[in-house]
């Protein structure tokens, strides 16, 4: 048994979708996404720049910061392949930083859907009983 949908209802739904996508609320949502820290940090890799399909420069990050001096200002990751003053190779520095970051992420408790997962048990963030 099929459901019958009249053409006029499809047209009305199409017009509603068109109106919503062109409205101020939708553009505000798009604008708020573009001003989010994630988009500012990684958005340059997803959107096209003035060069069309040209690959991004190695001396600039996605948010337009210049890293030609070898250090990324935000994360402090050593990007240059020149040897540092302390004699440690840049590959070793990067490897150590990535291992440290992985350890920090591993130790952080995961949060999903209002619950914190610790030791394989699901604990609610809100306590419903008396403590």
Curated annotation (Swiss-Prot):
Cleaved signal peptide residues: 1-25
Keyword DNA-binding in record: no
InterPro entries according to UniProt: P518
Phenylalanine amide carried by residues: 119
Function: Ligand for the G-protein coupled receptor QRFPR.
UniProt biased composition (Polar residues): 97-106
Domain of life: Eukaryota
Name of encoding gene: QRFP
Protein name: QRFP-like peptide
């Amino acid at each position: 048994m099929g459901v019958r949908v009249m053409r006029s209802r499809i047209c009305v739904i199409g017009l509603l979708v068109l109106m919503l996508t062109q409205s101020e609320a939708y553009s505000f949502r798009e604008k708020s996404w573009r001003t989010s820290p994630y988009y500012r940090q990684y958005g340059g890799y997803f959107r096209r720049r003035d060069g069309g399909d040209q690959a991004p420069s190695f001396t600039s990050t996605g948010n337009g910061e210049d890293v030609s001096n070898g250090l990324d200002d935000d994360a402090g990751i050593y990007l240059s392949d020149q040897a540092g003053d302390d004699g440690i190779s840049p590959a070793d520095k990067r490897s150590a930083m990535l291992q440290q970051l992985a350890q920090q992420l591993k130790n952080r408790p995961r949060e999903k859907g209002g619950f914190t997962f610790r030791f394989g048990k699901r604990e609610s963030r809100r306590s419903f009983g008396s403590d």
